[in-house]
Amino acid sequence: MENGKRDRQDMEVNTTPRKPRVLLAASGSVAAIKFGNLCHCFTEWAEVRAVVTKSSLHFLDKLSLPQEVTLYTDEDEWSSWNKIGDPVLHIELRRWADVLVIAPLSANTLGKIAGGLCDNLLTCIIRAWDYTKPLFVAPAMNTLMWNNPFTERHLLSLDELGITLIPPIKKRLACGDYGNGAMAEPSLIYSTVRLFWESQAHQQTGGTS
């Protein structure tokens, strides 16, 4: 009798879908001050880990992140590896994540991705990314930087990789200018990613609406 009860419990556990694993990343834009808010948006729905670049740390407050979110920096890439055979952090994070969301995406990191550069933890993850899994970017930069011809070329490169753009919005920017280039609000980024994920899951299960 006890064994039958345990078997039923095991079946219930096995049929419970796990939460999506979302890797959130911030690069060096003043919009990184909203990164803690972004993490909070995702934590109830998904299992979240965070990666930040060195320059983003000038803007974001580590204490603003939810306690359950593990934060990784460039230093962790090297401190976690001592010898051949040890886990490589950017590979482990790429394997762990179901979805990667870069918000904010700075002009500098945009250029690095488009050029295939991998000189920090975040860009190494992107270079090693499995593009059968979704990757979203939410750019944030000055209006003139956003309108620069290089930006258009870089965005085309991202589109060819299958990266999904969450476009910036028009508002008063941190520099005082008014125009396009502000990062989309964290709530919009969250809803965009969740809607995409749930629509993909719906298609895979053969559901119809």
UniProtKB/Swiss-Prot annotation:
Its EC number is 4.1.1.36. Changing residue 175 to S: Complete loss of activity. Its cofactor is FMN. Changing residue 142 to D: Complete loss of activity. Pathway: Cofactor biosynthesis; coenzyme A biosynthesis; CoA from (R)-pantothenate: step 3/5. FMN binds at residues 28-30, 53-55, 106-109, 140. N-[(R)-4-phosphopantothenoyl]-L-cysteine binds at residues 142, 172, 174, 183. Induction: Induced by salt stress. Disruption phenotype: No visible phenotype under normal growth conditions, but homozygous double mutants hal3a-1 and hal3b are embryonic lethal. Expressed in roots, shoots, leaves, flowers, developing siliques and seeds with highest expression in seed embryos and phloem. It comes from the Eukaryota. The record marks 175 as: Important for catalytic activity. Keywords: Coenzyme A biosynthesis, Decarboxylase, Flavoprotein, FMN, Growth regulation, Lyase, Stress response. Changing residue 30 to I: No effect on activity. Binds 1 FMN per subunit. InterPro entries: Flavin_trans-like (IPR036551), Flavoprotein (IPR003382). GO terms for molecular function: phosphopantothenoylcysteine decarboxylase activity. Changing residue 179 to A: Very low activity. Can reduce the oxidied intermediate. Changing residue 34 to Q: Small decrease of activity. It catalyses: N-[(R)-4-phosphopantothenoyl]-L-cysteine + H(+) = (R)-4'-phosphopantetheine + CO2. One of its GO terms (biological process) is hyperosmotic salinity response. Changing residue 95 to Q: Very low activity. Can reduce the oxidied intermediate. Involved in plant growth, and salt and osmotic tolerance. Catalyzes the decarboxylation of 4'-phosphopantothenoylcysteine to 4'-phosphopantetheine, a key step in coenzyme A biosynthesis. The enzyme is also able to decarboxylate pantothenoylcysteine to pantothenoylcysteamine. Homotrimer. Belongs to the HFCD (homooligomeric flavin containing Cys decarboxylase) superfamily. This is Phosphopantothenoylcysteine decarboxylase. It comes from Arabidopsis thaliana (Mouse-ear cress). The lineage of its organism: Eukaryota, Viridiplantae, Streptophyta, Embryophyta, Tracheophyta.
